[in-house]
């Protein structure tokens, strides 16, 4: 078995090293990740300049002067000697739940695998800090091992959030849907040394829909959250109303 491992926190991130170590007994693991922290990079590709790939002498990890999506894209289309059986991303320093998934470089790295027909799993530690990173890596390895032994049909994309708790305090796995957040906090306006205004993006909004069955609810109650995602963003329930709206303008059949 072959696993391609990436992340969005960068190739020096503790979460990447811990997950790499945890996956080594399961498969042949190739690690390629961004050179710098790319949190919030989403599915961005670098098209305005060439990319370079270097290899860290101490870990053997490859790193790219680009985004998480760049990293997986380069690996799958320009470097891989053989097609991986699974793309894995993480472990992210912080949760990726609800609308986070649209911004997340961690989820994006996994999504790029799906774009090329490779099943993928993204892992995030639900609270920032590495207090229980070893426990999270153990959980991630268990999920990957179960997937490799019992693959899901098709080309699944799983978004996994793990509570930042000791292993024995975890209550198990729950398959969830995405919850929903309140809008993000306003930007933080400051002034630079030259007197010019600068802006920091504000914090993510608090949970709006954290009802039973959501990723937010699972994490709050000590469960590992596993959410199946898809690439198709079509709002199928809106198709009839949108067709009627277009026909009313006399511009649609």
Curated annotation (Swiss-Prot):
Keywords from UniProt, A to Z, are: Cytoplasm, Hydrolase, Metal-binding, Nucleotide-binding
- Pfam families the record matches: SurE
Q: Which residues bind a divalent metal cation?
A: 8-9, 39, 92
Gene Ontology, cellular component aspect: cytoplasm
Q: What EC number(s) does its UniProt record assign? A: 3.1.3.5
Q: Name one GO molecular function term.
A: metal ion binding
Q: What class of enzyme is it?
A: hydrolase
Primary location class:
cytoplasm
Q: Is Cytoplasm found in the keyword set?
A: yes
Cofactor(s) recorded for this entry are: a divalent metal cation
Q: Cofactor binding mode, per the note?
A: Binds 1 divalent metal cation per subunit.
The compartments listed are: Cytoplasm
What disulfide bonds does the UniProt entry report for this chain?
A: none
Per the record, what are the reactions this protein catalyses? a ribonucleoside 5'-phosphate + H2O = a ribonucleoside + phosphate
SUPFAM superfamilies the record matches? SurE-like
Its function, per the record, reads: Nucleotidase that shows phosphatase activity on nucleoside 5'-monophosphates.
To which protein family does this belong? Answer: Belongs to the SurE nucleotidase family.
Protein name per Swiss-Prot or TrEMBL: 5'-nucleotidase SurE
Provenance organism: Burkholderia vietnamiensis (strain G4 / LMG 22486) (Burkholderia cepacia (strain R1808))
